[in-house]
A protein has these predicted regions:
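C-terminal segment of classical bacterial N-terminal signal peptides
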Residues: 12-20
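Non-globular, low-confidence helical/coil segments that flank catalytic cores
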Residues: 2, 7, 19-370
């Protein structure tokens, strides 16, 4: 079965097609890709260079997710992945790498350093990862580092459990949302180690923080906001938890949630969105059973449905399972997948397009204070 799937993937995305196209746009194009509650985001710069942040799921989902990433690569017209950032070593962020690397060259591998959460499921993945970066360039990112991408200012603001100490230009004002924060008393995980990036293209600004935890978000944003504001927030943690101390001072005009059908979008997280000052829209990769109709966004802002579409979305949010009991398997979505495409201009204007229904919305450039 796997050989059949591999054949189909190669048939749809042959190397000659993947590398024949050359990028010729004057926009920064961002592809937020559906990897079923994992993460994969492709940045295609006007220079022709590309940055991929994470590679989706491993295991049975690896071929599926690699194919979805390659579809975005083809649309972007990039010839290789110049910089691959692995935010952290969880299977939904790095699992698809080995499969992807068989179909497209990857020039540089960027990560946070040593794994702090070894285990039987992730150790073989990291062994294969080490074999890949041994053949290319490997960089351990530190807060304050810059990734050289023509036309972009790409700053690392978090990595390896550390955060940026010096505010970005124009940032550094006191953050009024810090006072009410209560630290979460939990052991550190790979999420705490996440590589976080702040990207500037002319006057357009966006951020992607992987699964950076609330405690590390506090370290980054308090007592002073070291980042300033953004136009687009590519949400951390799949939209599972959204903190006022991060979202509110960033003051995004739009946000994209790379969630799954039962991952991201619980009521408390959605309430933070809906009360966020200046946030016009939230775009969701999937409708979320965790939010139900009660807390969801309009359907035109949702990219993906299920293999067996529902006649209606439940009104009430899905109740969590009893403590100590696992949730039942999530509904399947292994068929056609749609992504969000963002096209940003140097003046700060950007357009988000839902490729499922063709709906797009343009957010005009505007003067923004921190």
């Amino acid at each position: 079965m796997r050989m059949t799937m591999l054949f189909l993937l190669v048939a749809v995305f042959p190397a000659s097609v993947a590398f024949a196209q050359t990028r010729s746009a004057n926009t920064l194009d961002i592809y937020v890709i559906d990897v079923e509650g994992g993460n994969a985001v492709l940045f295609a710069a006007p220079s022709g260079e590309s940055v991929l942040v994470d590679t989706g799921n491993g295991g049975d989902g690896a071929v599926r997710d690699a194919g979805r990433i390659l579809a975005a690569v083809k649309d972007a017209g990039v010839q290789r992945i110049d910089h691959l950032i692995i935010t952290h070593y969880h299977n939904d962020h790095i699992g698809g790498l080995s499969e992807l690397a068989t179909h497209i060259p990857i020039k540089e591998f960027i990560d946070h350093g040593a794994n702090i959460q070894p285990g039987a499921n992730i150790d073989p993945v990291l062994e294969r990862y080490a074999g890949l970066y041994a053949k290319g360039k490997h960089t351990v990112a530190k807060p304050g580092d810059k990734i050289p991408v023509g036309g972009l200012d790409w700053r690392i603001v978090a990595s390896g459990g550390e955060v940026l100490k010096t505010p970005l230009p124009g940032a550094g004002r006191p953050n009024p949302y810090c006072a009410s924060f209560k630290a979460v008393d939990v052991a550190k995980t790979e999420d705490d180690e996440s590589v976080g990036s702040f990207i500037t293209f002319g006057k357009f600004r966006t951020i992607i923080l992987g699964d950076l935890t609330l405690n590390r978000q506090f370290d980054l944003m308090c007592p002073n906001n070291r980042l300033g504001s953004v136009d687009l927030d590519i949400l951390a943690r799949h939209g599972n938890v959204n903190s006022e101390l991060l979202l509110y001072p960033l003051h995004p005009r739009a946000a994209i949630m790379n969630n799954g059908t039962r991952k991201g979008g619980p009521p408390e997280a959605m309430k933070v969105f809906f009360s966020s000052p200046g946030l016009a829209d939230v775009w969701q990769m999937h409708f979320s059973l965790l939010s139900g109709q009660e807390y969801t966004v309009p359907g035109m802002f949702i990219a993906n449905l299920l293999d067996q579409p529902q006649t209606a979305m439940p009104v009430a949010p899905l109740a969590p399972p009893p403590q100590g009991q696992p949730a039942p398997p999530a509904p399947q979505h292994n068929g056609t997948a749609y992504y969000f495409k963002v096209s940003a201009q140097p003046d700060g204007t950007f357009t988000v397009t839902n490729t499922r229904n063709g709906f797009s919305k343009t957010y005009k450039a505007s003067a923004k204070a921190e």
